[in-house]
Amino acid sequence: MTKDEYLITDRPLKALTIFAMPMILGSFFQQVYNMADSIIVGRFVGSSALAAVGACAALTNVFICVALGAGVGAGVLVSRYFGSKEYGKMKTVVSTSLLSFLVLSLLLSVFGFSFSYVMMKALQTPSDILRTSVLYLRVYFIGFPFLFMYNILSTMFTSVGESKIPLGLLIFSSILNIFLDLWMVRTLGLGVFGAALATLIAQGVSAVLSLLLFLYRIKRYQSSFSCFDLEELSFLLRIAVPSVLQQSTVSVGMMIVQSVVNPFGTQALAGYSATMRVENVFSLIFVSIGNAVSPFVSQNLGAKKIRRIKEGYHAALLLDIVFAVFAFLIIETLHTEISSLFLGKDGTALAYQVSSDYMRWLGYFFLFMGVKMATDGVLRGLGIMRPFLVANMVNLAIRLSVALSLAPRFGISFVWIAVPAGWFVNFLISYYALKKAFLGESGLSAR
């Protein structure tokens, strides 16, 4: 066995921890990368500019989730072929994925740029920040192919058991983004446009470096392969499409939720946007653990080591409990200070109240998110996508129904009050599907 195969040889808790930790750190730096715009714009331009950037978040998340969902399909197949040592098929999937998704990202970029104003208007973006939001969004869409390709390549790195290179690239691009943000926003006075341009440049550099490093990484696996294969594309889409639908539909749902928040005014939106950034920091810890479980499961499925899949799932749940307690303690102790990091002196009492109330409520229930993400990660790794999709749609339906029906009548707090209930019901559905899969182990081996 080579050192690349530790996910199918080392003790599951050890292997998953070693594999997941760089991904968790990477998620942290990903959010530093994302939050740099918000913090720097909020402090050096003002809360209205922060609200303008925050107003774009729900929409940009839709497009990011398309990239993440596409990466899931490629990642599951790459992991499985890597685990079974079918390196030719693995490289064919890599090449087919990159070519197909490059075309898709270019089409989405053109669409997003062309309809930025229409989409922001449809979200009921406050009129005083509409033009600034559209400007930020259009610059974002120019760089979208870079972001798309980086996310695909990052998933492929983790699929072959390599989580340290994506971490290194994220640290580099985060530092570059912060430096460019400060220079363009504070020194050059370019405001929101400067923040968007800084992100575009950092994403471009990161995507190019990722491509070069990944191509070098897979050179060691000598085997013939096809640059494009329709059969592999079909297998890829069978896994990717449900994941794209799940992730993008959830993000569309978040856009609808934001359209409920927007009428409460710019300051309420600023407070909501600040806590959304904080939620993303902590939630991506659990997302990272779930994402680490998927290639662990896929590689062991390819190697026909079903018992290790169960052990890996239990290890993931243990990690989730540890980080849920950590998240609760941080938020309960420092929620006011965290809010001030984004809102600064320009934030009103309303902005601080919205941010603090939302943040503390989430802190009590992050464990629900953790167990949901771990269970979803195992389902993805096994290629069991239908119940995965159904569970996440039910989660979204609970969140939307409460926000749309109760928040306009009883206050903004109902936007986030149903979030934990959605997470918990999602977990129950996913766990039921997973338990059925484990009971039919012979079916797993045949996948």
Predicted regions mapped to residue ranges:
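Hydrophobic transmembrane alpha-helices of multi-pass small-molecule transporters
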Residues: 62-65, 177-181, 206-211, 281-284, ...
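Short alpha-helical transmembrane segments in multi-pass integral membrane proteins
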Residues: 1-20, 78-143, 189-241, 297-364, ...
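Short runs within selected transmembrane alpha-helices of multi-pass transporters and secretion channels
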Residues: 71, 140-158, 166-174, 195-208, ...
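Small-residue-rich hydrophobic transmembrane alpha-helices
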Residues: 50-110, 147-166, 271-335, 369-383, ...
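Helix-terminus/linker motif at the lipid-water interface of multi-pass membrane proteins
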Residues: 28, 32-51, 120-127, 183-190, ...
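Interfacial/gating helices of multi-pass transporter permease domains
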Residues: 18, 41-61, 127-132, 192-193, ...
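Transmembrane helical elements of multi-pass membrane transporters/channels
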Residues: 18-37, 139, 150, 173, ...
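Residue-level signal for short hydrophobic patches within transmembrane helices
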Residues: 9, 13-32, 36, 59-66, ...
